[in-house]
A protein has these predicted regions:
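Surface-exposed, short loops/turns at beta-strand junctions within beta-sandwich domains
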Residues: 3-10
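Extracellular recognition modules
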Residues: 13-17
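Extracellular fibronectin type III
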Residues: 8, 19-34
C-alpha cells in the first residue's frame, strides 16, 4: 500500500484494521523537504568555486555514483551550507576523509538523505579553527558508517551551539579508531554559554573504540540534551554516555539500550542535576554500570538476541514474536 500527498516534516500515524478492530499501527515522520532561498548547485560546481562560495548554498547531489567530500574548511563567506542527497532511490553515497569546519561565521551546516562512509577515521564536523564557528548543525535521514564521531569542536568563536541528529542510522561508531571514539558530540575543548543537543528517531549500532570513550562530552556549560525514540545497540561497558553534564537538563524518552553495557555518567560529578526520564528501556542482558541514571527504567524480560535476532548483521528488526509493548526505541525496526 502506498500513501501519497503527505506533507514534509510531518508526523503521521497509520492504522491497520482487521474485522473492524485495530490490529497494528505505526507512527512515522515524513522526510524534510528541500528548502528554498538557497543558491543551488551540483557538487562539481561547488568544488570548482569552493573558496569563493558565499551566502546560503545548497549542494544538490543525485545519481548512484555519489561523491567524495574531502574539504576541511567552509569558505568564510558561507552563512548556510546544505549537502542534499536528491535521489528517488533513497540516499546518495558520500565518502569523507576529513571532517569539515568553518573559516568564518557559519550559521548552519546540514546533511540530508546521504549514505556517508568514513574513510579517514574522522568526524563529520571538525571545527578546529578559532577564527570560525558553526552555530547550528543538522543531520537527518542519513546512514553513517565507520565514523569516529559526529561533531568535534576543538576551537570556535561562537558562544552557543545547537546539534540535531534525526532519522539516522550510525553504524560502527569508532570501529576504525586506534584509540577512543568521539561519540555524538565532543566539545570539551571549548567553553560555550549554551549547548543544545537533540537526537531523535535514530539508531547507534556497534559503537566501540579501542579505548574508553564518551558519547557526549562537553565542558561544563549549561544547556539541554534530548534523546527521543532512539536505539543504542552493542556498546562498551567501559564507555560513558555523558561526561561533564552536571549543569545540563537531560530528557530521555522511549529509548532502548541492548547488547553490551554503558556507564550512564562518566563519574558522580557528571550526573545531571536535572534528569527527566519517560520511557528508558534496556534488554535483560544489557548493563548500566555505576554511576547509574538515578531514575527508574524498565528492564525488558527479553535478551538482546531475542529482541533483535539479526543484530549481529546490524539489522535491528524486531523478532516476529516480540510483543508490541516491547517494541520500543527507534520505530524504523518495528516492521
Amino acid at each position: 500500500m502506498t500513501i501519497t500527498g503527505l506533507a514534509s516534516s510531518t508526523e503521521y500515524t497509520a492504522y491497520a484494521f482487521a474485522n473492524g478492530s485495530i490490529c497494528s499501527r505505526i507512527t512515522f515522520t515524513t522526510k524534510k523537504g528541500k528548502p528554498t532561498g538557497y543558491t543551488e548547485m551540483t557538487w562539481e560546481d561547488a568544488l570548482a568555486n569552493w573558496d569563493n562560495l558565499s551566502g546560503k548554498v545548497l549542494i544538490n547531489v543525485s545519481g548512484t555514483e555519489g561523491f567524495a567530500q574531502e574539504k576541511e574548511s567552509i569558505a568564510a563567506g558561507v552563512t548556510h551550507l546544505i549537502f542534499w542527497g536528491d535521489s528517488q532511490d533513497g540516499q546518495v553515497n558520500m565518502t569523507i576523509k576529513k571532517g569539515i569546519g568553518a573559516s568564518g561565521i557559519c550559521d548552519k551546516v546540514e546533511f540530508h538523505n546521504l549514505n556517508i562512509t568514513d574513510e579517514g577515521n574522522t568526524t563529520l564536523i571538525y571545527q578546529n579553527g578559532a577564527s570560525g564557528c558553526i552555530k547550528e548543525i543538522e543531520v537527518t535521514s542519513c546512514t553513517i558508517t565507520n565514523i569516529r564521531g559526529i561533531v568535534r569542536m576543538n576551537a570556535s568563536t561562537s558562544n552557543a551551539m545547537s546539534v540535531t541528529i534525526d532519522d539516522c542510522i550510525i553504524k560502527g561508531l569508532g570501529r576504525a579508531a586506534t584509540s577512543n571514539h568521539y561519540g555524538l558530540l565532543l566539545s570539551d575543548k571549548v567553553t560555550l554559554t549554551t549547548l543544545n543537543l537533540v537526537v531523535s528517531n535514530t539508531s547507534i549500532i556497534v559503537s566501540k573504540g579501542a579505548s574508553a570513550s564518551q558519547f557526549i562530552h562537553k565542558s561544563g556549560q549549561p544547556g539541554t540534551i534530548t534523546i527521543k525514540d532512539c536505539t543504542f545497540y552493542d556498546m562498551s561497558a567501559s564507555d560513558a554516555f555523558c561526561r561533564d553534564t552536571k549543569d545540563m537538563t537531560i530528557t530521555i524518552s522511549n529509548t532502548l539500550f541492548a547488547k553490551g553495557g554503558v556507564k550512564p555518567f562518566y563519574n558522580t560529578s557528571s550526573v545531571a542535576t536535572t534528569l527527566n526520564v519517560n520511557g528508558l528501556y534496556k534488554a535483560s542482558d544489557f548493563s548500566f554500570v555505576t554511576p547509574d541514571w538515578g531514575k527508574d527504567y524498565t528492564s525488558l524480560p527479553l535478551t538482546s538476541d531475542q529482541l533483535f535476532p539479526n543484530g549481529s548483521s546490524e539489522d535491528l528488526t524486531f523478532g516476529a514474536d516480540v510483543p508490541e509493548e516491547y517494541r520500543v526505541g527507534d520505530q524504523r525496526w518495528n516492521k
